[in-house]
Amino acid sequence: MKLKSLALLLMTIAMPAMAEQVSVNSKGISLILDVENGKPAQYLYFGSKLNAADLQNLTVATNGRMDAYPAYGLNTPAEAALAMRHSDGNLSTVLVATGSDVKQEANATVTTIHLKDPVYNIKVDLKYRAYKDVDMIEAWTEISNGEKGTVTLTTFASAMLPIRRGDVWMSHLSGTWAAEAQLSHEKLQPGEFVIRNNDGVRNSHTDHAEVMFSLNGKGQENTGAVIGAALAYSGNYKLKTVTDDTEYHYFFAGINEQNSEYHLKKGETFKTPALVLTYSNEGLSGASRNFHKWGRKYVLAHGDQERDILLNSWEGVYFDINQKGMDQMMADIHSMGGELFVMDDGWFGKKYPRKKDNTALGDWVVDTEKLPDGIEGLLRDAKKNGVKFGIWIEPEMTNTKSELYEKHPDWVIKAPKRDAVVGRGGTQLVLDLGNPKVQDFVFGVVDDLLTKYPEIAYIKWDANMAIMNHGSQYLSAADQSHLYIAYHQGFAKVIDRIRAKYKDVVIQCCASGGARANWGCLRGFDEFWVSDNTDALQRIYMQYGTSYFFPAIAMASH
């Protein structure tokens, strides 16, 4: 009986390749598409869940472009979700439906709409995961190359959504260092509204990859129809809303393709990040609650567990780490009812001790002058003081003044034939996570710490530099445009390896403040640092904005 139940969970239900409605339903919302063999798949509806009678009355709108995944080439004035250069140089692509299927998961259904180019051996699968107990739908795309040679993807959105014109307003977050996540509301006007990121490593200091569309006027907290959308990606992104002479706005979201055209080799499949969609008739707060429920249950590590009250050493001592001082801080936080102490930057480096921010990143060995009893002594003191112990690392980075850089200068991201632009301390550089050897090294930083010191309960993972230099010493000259995408593919592989081995450790993603507040990172982390600004009054506004898309449990605080 158990075997039979398992088989049913994994069963794929094939649907006939003919004109039909494909319904993607969560607990209370529906996404309906028209899928007819040999024609483009088209949107019919997105909103509150429909019953059978409602479905019978749906028709494809004629006053807008309803293609579910519009391709470039035969309607060049229109915005496209997909554009490519075929192996013979042809820039035109046509996508028509060949059928659909549904796969049952434990708490969701995954609907796939199969598309292909009738002339070229290009297949595109539109994927929709609808959760059974929360009103969220994840939409992503998988593009497969069956041509004889390499094709070049120049535009590859995760998804497109048409929104009927009217009094439609967009709510989104923007800001800067120490003033992140400021909420703005703007009415959609004719033209293009673009939110994009080019940082390379982090992506939410200035703008966020999450938006809400209020369909009945300026967004209200508890009333009105609202569409929420979040691109679950840790790297460069682009959200674009196009309003032209039709009756619709067209919302596109995906990886920012600027300087990132992707060469898809024969037999390969490219998978986009997911665009997470929700809908609510209970205003902005209703959409927020959907994000919170989904994130806590299906994305965040330990999303159902209370976070410990912690003290971090940074604001107290900065780089002035020492054994006695750490012991005293542990005693102090315990006396105030705290449960966790986190030792921040400044604890490492042998040949180049970390006395300030220009040395030792990559040399993850204890500075025994500062900490003569090592991490063992810190763990002993934590136990004595009745608190857990956590530690700071920045494993994606190095300094030119480090043993790591001396051994592996070929591991850094650097433009060929040019001096590298350096970051913090005048020496910081970014390691190339597209390189499998670098991935092994970064995994090893965490693995070594947690293998030697399994009592470590918490890791603060920082990232204090953007990719300033476009150049991978690992990728071929022809594939240099893969740099940003390869970096985040490598980042995801590392986080997956860490989580597979260390499920219980709590990990915070920090990035010069709130630069990694995104659902792409949170798939492997417990929380993110909201801002380096810890002023209590100013934090209210930043956490208020952040709360539109992220639950309070995801906002780290110390």
Residue ranges and their predicted role:
Residues 28, 141-143, 318, 349, ...:
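Active-site and adjacent substrate-binding regions of carbohydrate-active enzymes
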Residues 302-444, 453, 457-458:
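Aromatic-lined carbohydrate-binding/catalytic grooves of carbohydrate-active enzymes
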Residues 2-9:
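Sec-dependent signal peptide recognition
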Residues 14-16:
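N-terminal signal peptide c-region/cleavage motif recognized by signal peptidases
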Residues 20-32, 39-242, 258:
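Polysaccharide-binding surfaces and accessory modules of carbohydrate-active proteins
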Residues 68-96, 213-240, 279-300, 338-345, ...:
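Glycine-rich, aromatic-flanked loop segments that form ligand/cofactor-binding clefts
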Residues 399, 405-440, 444, 485-558:
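Glycan-recognition surfaces
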Residues 22, 84, 91-97, 262-281:
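Short Pro-Gly-centered flexible turn/kink motifs
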